[in-house]
Each structure stands twice: as structure tokens, then as C-alpha cells.
Amino acid sequence: MKEMNRREFLTLSGASVAMLALAACGGAPSTPVAPTGKEAKVLEALNLYRGELSPLTLDSGLNKAAEEVAKMILLNKPLDDMNSYAEFDKAIAGYKKAEAYQPIGLSMNVETNKAAPRYVCQDDAKLMGEQLMAQTGDPALKQLKSPKLKLVGIHVFEYGSATYWVAVVAEGGKTA
């Protein structure tokens, strides 16, 4: 067995303590994140659309779910089986009623079963909010009027020559 000098021992001990601390807390909790850039504009637009309802809070775990929705769109393949949704389902697991709400900004072609983006991201949050208010026939958007919704995840992405956004909502955070 190799003898360690003091520095090696302290380094190893410190790493062990850090690993034990992470293991004890069960990993990083999903927490609200401060929106920046385009996500902040989309969040502002969504809250403008909600009107008098309490504002939605951006959640890092739901951001991952929104990213999975964008990946489904970018694949440009038919979403024919449940495996197509596996990563999205993992990302929303544990969120209160997240599975009950449709992703916002996702449009499905019923003939090809391919996903497409619906809402273009713009620099003017007020204009985006007004455009959301003018939309008709989008059940995913109508669900934003639910007072039960508290959290949102947003992902902004490039598709073709435009920038789009998608959002995923939940009534509450992850349960232990």
C-alpha cells in the first residue's frame, strides 16, 4: 500500500466528503432559475398572456423538458411510438400534473405525425404576448389560463431560418 503525503490525504479526504454530501442530498434539486435573454422575453410574453393570474416561475427541470420537446421538432421524424417521448417523460417525472398539460409551441401534423414549431421568438415581449392573445384554436395555449399553473420551462431554438420557442408547464415542483 502506498503511503500518502499530507496534501494527497487532504485532497482525497475533501473529495470523499464532497461525494458523501452529494449522495446524502440525493442530487441537485430542480430550482427556479433567473431567466436571461430570449427566455426572459418568452416568460414575459407568457405572463402577459396570463393577465391577472399569478406569474409563472421559470424552472430548470422543466427547461430540460422543453429542450426535449425542441429535440422532437428538430428530429423532423414521425413520432409513432412511446419511445419518441421517453426523454420528455423522464424530464417531467415528479412534477405536479405536468403530464396533464400539452407542450406549448408544439404543433403536430396529424397526417405525417411529425412535430413542428408554432411560435416565433421575437425581441419584443409585449408583441409576442399580443400575438399569443390573438391565437385561436390552440388548446395548449388555452391551458395557460389555468390559475393552478405555477412553473414553466422554456427552450428557444433555431429551426429553418427562424427562432422559435416551446414551453412546458406544471402546477408544482418535483415531489420527493
What does each model-found stretch correspond to?
Residues 1-20:
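N-terminal secretory signal peptides and thylakoid transit peptides that target proteins
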